[in-house]
Regions:
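Active-site-proximal beta-strand elements of phosphoester/diester hydrolases
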Residues: 14-26, 137-147, 164-169, 212-216
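Conserved catalytic scaffold of divalent metal-dependent phosphoesterases
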Residues: 80, 95, 99-185
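Binuclear metal-dependent phosphoesterase catalytic core
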Residues: 129-131, 213-279
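Conserved beta-sheet core of the metallophosphoesterase superfamily
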Residues: 172-239
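Core catalytic region of metal-dependent phosphoesterases/phosphodiesterases
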Residues: 2-4, 22, 30-129
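Non-catalytic terminal accessory segments
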Residues: 7, 251-332
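Catalytic metal-binding/acid-base residues of hydrolase active sites
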Residues: 23-25, 65-66, 73, 97-100, ...
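Active-site neighborhood of phospho(di)ester-bond hydrolases with catalytic His/Asp-centered motifs
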Residues: 18-20, 59-64, 91-97, 121-126, ...
């Protein structure tokens, strides 16, 4: 079903399997080398089904179940439905930015169809969602979709629970972040906040009593995730997240033109970060769409290159990533 403030019945389970941003889509990401796509993604979800059912776990998907709001490949949607219906506990899915064409979930989005057909329970509005009984402890679960305000106080959301966990899909500044990212903050009455959206696993941050965590995506779409290990995570009764291995191939990206001497890695990393901070400061997503081919952003970056005497290796990396960003905006 689609939840807009409704609460699901409480369930007894051995924990909650947390699955980060699957990005299921029929289009193979630009530098992935997979001969057949998206079997790598579906295979990870099938492994998640096995883990959840073997260990009697409830299931939460952190958002971006789909890579595009409208998935046109009917066969792929049927395959995905078949996988998702394999869970003993129906997955609860947060709404991510890739799941929606507008600011909120609508009937035109593929994710809405899965909710209406009871394949998954989709959380469309920020609210408390359900309670789970894990051993002797009761855990309250709430969610905030992409673009909606994360609550600052969760004390009135649940009564009689031992732990409150909230799930979000936002740009959070775990490691300092970029312009526009929200620093972790204390949410009154909330013990754990688990975020999607950011694709790399982040170190947890404690703000007041609220521990913020970001497990990362299970689908590596871009080369900046070449070292990211896709995992699912089990939320236990203590509020800890335990990593679970998922099947993945290490050599899945075409790195032509992207390989840099290892001795220069730290310098390259700093220069790339500096260039992208400039990019994000210079252009909003709206302006990127307005420029169409990314020319406005490209001019800003080239000016930054000239100002900082940026190496050719870093210039090649940033230009390639900018090209990928423009392509993704064109498809969205």
């Amino acid at each position: 079903m689609i939840l807009s403030g409704d609460r699901l019945p409480s369930v007894a389970c051995s924990g909650v399997l947390v699955i980060g941003d699957p990005h299921v889509g029929s289009r193979r990401p630009g530098r992935r080398k997979d001969v057949v796509w998206p079997q790598a993604v579906l295979g990870k979800l099938e492994r998640c089904v096995a883990i959840a059912n073997e260990r009697q776990l409830a299931v939460v998907i952190l958002g971006d179940l789909f890579d595009r709001p409208v998935e046109t490949d009917v066969a792929l949607k049927n395959q995905l439905i078949r996988v998702l219906k394999g869970f003993d506990h129906r997955p609860i899915v947060n709404v991510g930015n890739h799941d929606i064409q507008h600011t909120m979930l609508t009937d035109g989005d593929s994710l809405a169809l899965l909710g209406l057909c009871d394949v998954v329970d989709v959380v469309a509005t920020s609210a408390p969602v359900t309670e789970v009984q894990v051993g002797s402890r009761r855990i309250g679960i709430g969610m905030t979709p992409y673009g909606q305000a994360i609550p600052t106080d969760a004390r009135g959301s649940f009564s009689g629970v031992d732990l409150r966990a909230w799930f979000t899909h936002h740009d959070i500044a775990f490691d300092g972040g970029y312009p526009g990212a929200v620093p972790p903050f204390a949410v009154e009455g909330c013990d754990l906040l688990v975020n999607g959206h950011i694709h790399k696993t982040q170190k947890s941050v404690l703000a007041g009593r609220t521990r913020w965590m970001n497990p990362g995506t299970i689908t590596r779409q871009s080369v900046d995730l070449v070292d990211h290990v896709p995992r699912a995570w089990i939320l236990d009764e203590s509020g800890a997240l335990e990593p679970q291995a998922l099947p993945f191939e290490s050599n899945v990206f075409d790195l032509t033109g992207r390989v840099v001497d290892a001795a220069d890695a730290s310098v390259v990393a700093r220069e790339v970060e500096s260039a992208f901070v400039t990019l994000l400061q210079a252009e909003s997503a709206t302006e990127l769409k307005r420029s169409g081919d990314g020319s406005i952003v490209r001019d800003e970056i080239e000016a930054k290159f000239a100002q900082d005497s940026t190496s050719e290796a870093v210039r090649a990396i940033v230009r390639s990533l900018l090209g990928e960003a423009v392509e993704r905006h064109a498809r969205s």
